[in-house]
């Protein structure tokens, strides 16, 4: 049983709604469309070899999250320092070459297997906007890997803040309003309860939770939340979301 569903939700049931209510889909990128967890694990094990062979996924993720907390800057270059923190904590090689390798590996994180096709289908009906805590350098790599599906994008190095800061959402709201879209036109789509679903709901957005870890224990590489926010829509995959939103 997924431990997420053992916790209570802090929102009430919503009246069923149609996807036709929306014109804009705003997407979290890393974790929702890009499989950063596999990217982190593969990079750590490739760089460290036998030294990392006995480390569990959860142990690596725990050190990775502490490294992100210790180095909260949102430039892709900070991943050099995040890896050094992780490596020292886990007793792995922490030389400059290893840190450089991890930083470069971050820019090569790949999409989930269903992301590209789902976005291609969704773009036939909706305006697609990336809302990412990554910087512009990283997003350019991820967008290319995803087939360049976005009509617009907002990055943390442009907003000056990162999600879950409400100012990030305010920045995008203002940006989309310049194109004639209201908040009620927007459905926010994300995996992270911490960075996206909880705060977006509090700000009055309709939200779609892509629960990438459905059926898996714990929160993986994403920060934990004490209570889950109940979304307006809930799917385990982007394919299932696209099937519901635009049909098969």
Regions found by a protein language model. Give the residues of each.
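Asp-based, Mg2+/Mn2+-dependent phosphohydrolase catalytic module
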Residues: 3-11, 15-25, 37-38, 97, ...
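Alpha-helical packing segments of well-folded alpha/beta enzyme cores
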Residues: 115-118
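N-terminal helical cap/lid subdomain that shapes the substrate entry/recognition surface
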Residues: 19-113, 124, 137-138
